[in-house]
Amino acid sequence: MKAKLRVQRHQKISEIDERLYGSFIEHLGRAVYNGIYEPTHETADAEGFRNDVKQLVKELNVPLVRYPGGNFVSGYKWEDSVGPKENRPRKVDLAWRTIETNQVGVHEFAKWAKEVDTEVNMAVNLGTRGIQEAMELLEYCNFEGGTYWSDLRKEHGTEKPFGFKTWCLGNEMDGPWQIGHKTAEEYGRLAAETAKAMKLVDDSIELVVCGSSSSKMPTFGDWERVVLEHTYEYVDYLSLHCYYGNPENNLGNYLAQSLDMDQFIKTVVSICDYVKVKKGSDKQINLSFDEWNVWYHSNEQDAAMEPWQIAPPLLEDIYNFEDALLIGCLLITLLKNSDRVKIACLAQLVNVIAPIMTENDGETWKQTIFYPFMHVSNHGRGVVLTPSVESDSYSVEGFKHVPYLETIATYNEENNELVIFAVNRSQEETLEFVFEQEGFEFESIIEETAMEGFDVKATNAAAAEVVKPSIVQKATIADNQLTTSLSPLSWNVIRIKVK
């Protein structure tokens, strides 16, 4: 089967905001405790954070991490997480029905973030709390000094402000499961007033307002419209959340789910632009897709979990090869929409629906989904080139005209590198792939990488990381175009030196 991608040097979708490759750490399960933080581990640093985990986070090259939630934040009292550790209270976390020790808080997480070269995307509690508490947290984190909260930060050991620049106004407030769930009208009013107050404290921050927690929510669409009508002038981004799964074991349908993500994004963009026109505004609201991933493997295990434990193993999906293929498709979809999606957070980062897994007192290991994310985060920099794709397609329940080839190309002018990311969705046929371009001169193929040939249900484990990429040498360059073969059910990365 033949397939083709064409690009032109000067036809671009957008520059890539590096925050597109963000992630998420929530006080949930073993994400924090026995995840990034395990003071008794042999690799633990002076603060108690595992150096082996830090190394894997650095490999992923994550520029931004959302924190501390998630559902958790809607019951969070941030003051419990600062000051001497021995004085911090243990509290019940109603979101996940566990016990929170508060041994990791604002200061510790900020230090960890600095160690792994990432920025903190801080969330405020608009479930059980409100404007005053959000202002005080921002003052504590970002104000230079000379006030009660900023001086308290100094007393707690941090002289200079943390300088967190991106803030989330609550989490999934449309969800009936959320502590302090609100209607769009209620949340829109609260978010607007909170945003106004926060920007009076620090006008350099950017704010993310809650969109729908899923495109399947009965209030989807109306929620976005009403919330934006209240907040449009005061916020910078609208959030989207979406998780995918394959409980019915329909691979063709599963690998087509990236089309659902694409439609979700385009629908939300339309709503943003409708409100812009309605308000007669010159301002453009962009998107923060700050929760996305595969999530369904652990549902049964989680339902049987005993409540009120400290750091129980919750949401520990073990990902397989087909999950890695879908993650590749979803990453390509985010790049295709990078003109409006400026922030995205793979949810989550460690142990909880995560690319990185740890054993208590033991090893770390990489899940199958680690690799596509690592490839795109490290090599998908610069600009996204507008794609023209020729590919046969298939139809499956819920989706018509699903292309066998899912692909995009990026160009990084700093290092003269053109990178092709491609998934072959076909379960049986190799794609004879041709890459045509205008405006570049090929110098050499830097590297061709593929994840291919695995059973779709194959997984990794601490004892054996079986599903991982290999260096291949199938691509050839002639007449300033590239040809290669993309194996059935494969994730492919081709890096080309150009001038």
Report residues per predicted region:
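Active-site His/acidic residue clusters
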Residues: H241-Q257
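Non-catalytic accessory regions flanking glycosidase/transglycosidase catalytic cores in CAZymes
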Residues: M1-W223, E229-Y237, M261-D262, K266-A303, ...
